[in-house]
């Protein structure tokens, strides 16, 4: 194949749909093109497909924006393990993806520390436990910890027929994966222990792979193997976040990744399907279609829960250092950052949600932080809505 033809095919908008490429360029041309990609550009991974052959990826064809990197490397000023606003959306979107009914009010109720009142809230509580577990960087990625994460977030809430056997880390029978156009079986049971050990070893390897790419590869491979009877997608998304937390991306749990997936979950499932369909044509499994999807539809669209600009933080930090911020005000400020992010709130709402301060204390806090330029205020009738961020005049309403 000459260079001009190769370049034309490489830049084709249907690059990751080899069946469409065949229609446009011919079966022979696409086969030769795929072979050249594998030989000259694809990087092998220490993971295998269902035939026991290595997975590959094309690192230069899934670009991550600089802004996405900055977002995930930003340090949330909240003292909490995760953003309440962001993780409310994360849990809500996860259940949307799985077609499980939930409400944001029930999710916030559980995240605020209340006990579950029904089966729906028990599932939410499981997600909360999972998020708390991966938020602790002392909880390293091991097969034992992965099993524990699965049990507390999902496994404990499944019907008996979908539960793992005692002392089993993975399923003991066949499973079929739904979500795409046609169901397909997961990895054969006897191969799961070896494949999952390789996956965990890969997560812990210092191999120079871009960490955001690697997180998405872990996400893909986990769901591809499907090690459980149920809850695989949910655990794959938690695994993705867990890896980013372990790698020092502090904003990962202040970012509702699953919201972007839920907005177009068909594209999410199609990315999986493209990997498998392309393998039938190319003769090897290239995970780049999933990486390309994740970079464009998730990473490059990220907006971490809003925090004040640097100048506002300096105002707060200076006041804190000078003893002008009380301990209760510090706790309230951290709660506001975590619970509301960029959302508006009222003093009554903050009193109800925070649960550990009198209304007079809440009122004094919002007035003081508005005067400092840390909160904006908007009057609507008899109500005042506050939001994190500075105002033009800094005067109280």
Question: Where do the PLM segments sit?
Answer:
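FIC/Doc superfamily catalytic core
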Residues: 1-229, 233-397
């Amino acid at each position: 194949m000459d260079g001009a033809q190769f370049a034309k095919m490489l830049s084709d908008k249907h690059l990751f749909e080899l069946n469409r490429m065949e229609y446009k360029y011919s079966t022979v041309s696409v086969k030769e093109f795929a072979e050249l990609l594998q030989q000259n550009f694809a990087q092998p991974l220490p993971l295998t497909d269902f035939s026991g052959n290595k997975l590959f990826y094309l690192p230069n064809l899934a670009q991550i924006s600089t802004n996405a990197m900055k977002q995930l490397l930003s340090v949330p000023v909240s003292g909490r393990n995760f953003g309440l606003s962001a993780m409310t959306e994360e849990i809500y979107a996860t259940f949307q993806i799985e077609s499980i009914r939930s409400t944001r009010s029930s999710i916030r109720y559980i995240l605020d520390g209340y006990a579950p009142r029904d089966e729906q809230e028990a599932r939410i509580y499981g997600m909360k436990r999972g998020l708390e577990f991966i938020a602790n960087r002392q909880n390293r990625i091991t097969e034992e910890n992965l099993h524990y994460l699965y049990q507390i977030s999902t496994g404990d809430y499944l019907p008996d027929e979908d539960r793992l056997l005692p002392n089993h880390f993975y399923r003991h029978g066949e499973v079929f994966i739904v979500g795409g156009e046609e169901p397909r079986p997961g990895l054969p049971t006897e191969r799961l222990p070896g494949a999952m050990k390789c996956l965990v070893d890969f997560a812990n390897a210092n191999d120079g792979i871009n960490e955001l790419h690697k997180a998405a590869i872990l996400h893909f491979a986990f769901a591809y193997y499907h090690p459980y009877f149920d809850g695989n997608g949910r655990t794959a998304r938690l695994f993705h976040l867990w890896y980013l937390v372990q790698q020092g991306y502090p904003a990962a749990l202040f970012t509702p990744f699953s919201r972007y997936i839920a907005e177009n979950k068909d594209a999410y499932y199609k990315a999986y399907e493209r990997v498998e369909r392309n393998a039938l044509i190319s003769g090897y499994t290239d995970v780049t279609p999933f990486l390309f999807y994740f970079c464009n539809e998730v990473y490059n669209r990220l907006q971490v829960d809003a925090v004040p600009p640097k100048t506002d933080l300096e105002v707060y930090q200076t006041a804190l250092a000078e003893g002008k911020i009380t301990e209760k005000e510090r706790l309230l400020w951290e709660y506001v950052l975590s619970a509301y992010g960029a959302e508006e709130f009222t003093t009554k709402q903050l009193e109800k949600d925070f649960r550990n301060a009198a209304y007079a204390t809440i009122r004094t806090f919002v007035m003081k932080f508005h005067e400092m330029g840390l909160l904006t205020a908007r009057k609507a009738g008899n109500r005042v809505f506050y939001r994190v961020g500075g105002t033009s005049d800094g005067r109280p309403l």
